[in-house]
């Protein structure tokens, strides 16, 4: 594994790589959280958005040529990237470029699928003349050095490499499921199968795609042109392009592991409200698996200019407190109790309110005497005084969205409030 272990060669490979981040999807399984924003723009971890994780991984890996492909409700995503990701130096050939879906002369339609999104932008890829193209999902949470994967790809002689992780077999139907041989060559790939193939010797686990692909540039163009000429194709990497590649060329798997322990590294698909809630709740633990305080692998984002969080004693003498929780800039806890919760920026919790096991997105006002438990409160909500959320299942289902694991999702629309700003 000479290339993978040699920093000089890895840096040459990453400099010769163009990253394409797929950021055009709605993510319908997140329910009302994506009514007004594309999934990669969904806030996460107190101050970030999902798109910040693949973008940060690129920067930290030495990949400084990045295209972000957008389509569905992209304004807040575009705004976020323009404000927070303009620090690369164009004179050095570095960039984060936004590529919105465009109606072209020969194809007056939007992107028909993930593969079609890349196919429609072959001219842009050609203009940058990379040797390798790294295709990334824009909505997963993880920290990964892509240099090792690109080096393994170059060393293996494969035309395509797929990043993969193990997941419980009962959850594998939400992903592309892979079968590999002892040399990690991919033998089969089934997108979201009803009956996922188990791993050999481990019937309760399945090997699934992370939505991360490395291609030799010219081979990618060949695959996409073949797919475009196939009228039966759904224009999707997982459903069409990867199975075609496996049938005709060498496709390699790249298991995502921690470089120190060798164990599978942290990776979360927060594609449902339950998964989103759980991944955020994990962060408030004493030693979470995802370390957001890691100075060696920072997660970059747009930094709004906000004052520090403030804790105020209420008129009745009760102190504003936050226990086993994360709070953010601009938050005010006024004679209220926050416990086991994660608060994004500019959240105000007014006297007598209690917030337990909740994820509160930015710019939320929690009125006096409210009780909120096991809930996700969407951005911009104004919770009226005395409102109770998370205690009466029947009432919660009548007014809000309740997940299979009884997490209550509350949006401004559900409260009868107007969406006041782009999110």
Curated annotation (Swiss-Prot):
GO terms, molecular function: ATP binding; glucose-1-phosphate adenylyltransferase activity
Residues reported to bind alpha-D-glucose 1-phosphate: 111, 176, 191-192, 209
Keyword ATP-binding part of the UniProt annotation: yes
GO biological process: glycogen biosynthetic process
Keywords of the record: ATP-binding, Carbohydrate metabolism, Glycogen biosynthesis, Glycogen metabolism, Nucleotide-binding, Nucleotidyltransferase, Transferase
Keyword Nucleotide-binding: yes
CDD domains xrefs: ADP_Glucose_PP (cd02508), LbH_G1P_AT_C (cd04651)
Pfam families the record matches: Hexapep_GlmU (PF24894), NTP_transferase (PF00483)
Reactions catalysed according to its record: alpha-D-glucose 1-phosphate + ATP + H(+) = ADP-alpha-D-glucose + diphosphate
Pathway where this protein functions: Glycan biosynthesis; glycogen biosynthesis
Enzyme Commission no: 2.7.7.27
Subunit structure of this chain's protein: Homotetramer.
Family the UniProt entry places it in: Belongs to the bacterial/plant glucose-1-phosphate adenylyltransferase family.
PANTHER family with a match to the protein in the record: GLUCOSE-1-PHOSPHATE ADENYLYLTRANSFERASE (PTHR43523:SF2), GLUCOSE-1-PHOSPHATE ADENYLYLTRANSFERASE-RELATED (PTHR43523)
Function comment: Involved in the biosynthesis of ADP-glucose, a building block required for the elongation reactions to produce glycogen. Catalyzes the reaction between ATP and alpha-D-glucose 1-phosphate (G1P) to produce pyrophosphate and ADP-Glc.
Name assigned to this protein: Glucose-1-phosphate adenylyltransferase 1
Gene name in the database record: glgC1
């Amino acid at each position: 594994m000479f290339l993978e272990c040699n920093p000089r060669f890895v840096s040459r490979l990453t400099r010769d790589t163009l990253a394409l981040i797929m950021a055009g999807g709605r993510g319908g399984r997140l329910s009302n959280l994506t009514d007004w924003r594309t999934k990669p723009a969904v806030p996460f971890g107190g101050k970030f958005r999902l798109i910040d994780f693949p973008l940060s991984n690129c920067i930290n890996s030495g990949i400084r040529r990045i295209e972000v492909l957008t389509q569905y409700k992209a304004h807040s995503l575009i705004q976020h990237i323009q404000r927070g990701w303009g620090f690369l130096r164009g004179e050095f050939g570095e960039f984060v470029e936004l590529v919105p879906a465009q109606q072209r002369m020969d194809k007056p339609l939007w992107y028909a699928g993930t593969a079609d999104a890349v196919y429609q932008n072959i001219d842009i890829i050609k203009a940058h003349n990379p040797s390798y193209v790294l295709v990334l999902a824009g909505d997963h949470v993880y920290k990964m050095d892509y240099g090792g994967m690109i080096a393994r790809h170059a060393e293996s002689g494969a035309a395509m490499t797929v990043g993969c992780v193990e997941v419980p077999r009962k959850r594998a139907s939400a992903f592309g499921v892979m079968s590999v041989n002892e040399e990690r060559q991919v033998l089969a790939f089934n997108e979201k199968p009803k009956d996922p193939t188990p791993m050999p010797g481990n019937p309760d686990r399945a090997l699934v795609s992370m939505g991360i692909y490395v291609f030799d540039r010219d081979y990618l163009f060949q695959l996409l042109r073949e797919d475009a000429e196939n009228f039966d194709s759904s224009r999707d990497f997982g459903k069409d392009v990867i199975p075609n590649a496996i049938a005709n060329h060498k496709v390699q798997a790249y298991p995502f592991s921690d470089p120190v322990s060798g164990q599978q590294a942290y990776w979360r698909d927060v594609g449902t409200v339950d998964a989103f809630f759980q991944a955020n709740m994990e962060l408030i633990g004493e030693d979470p698996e995802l370390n957001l305080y890691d100075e060696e692998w920072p997660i970059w984002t747009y930094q709004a200019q906000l004052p520090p969080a403030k804790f105020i004693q209420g008129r009745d003498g009760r102190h504003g407190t936050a226990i086993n929780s994360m709070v953010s800039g601009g938050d005010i806890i006024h004679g209220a109790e926050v416990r086991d919760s994660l608060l994004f920026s500019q959240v105000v919790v007014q006297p007598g309110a209690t917030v337990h096991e909740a994820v509160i997105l930015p710019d939320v006002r929690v009125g006096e005497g409210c009780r909120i438990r096991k809930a996700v409160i969407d951005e911009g909500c104004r919770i009226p005084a005395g409102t109770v959320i998370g205690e009466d299942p029947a009432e919660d289902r009548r007014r809000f969205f309740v997940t299979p694991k009884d997490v209550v999702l509350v949006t401004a629309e559900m409260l009868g409030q107007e969406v006041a700003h782009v999110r």
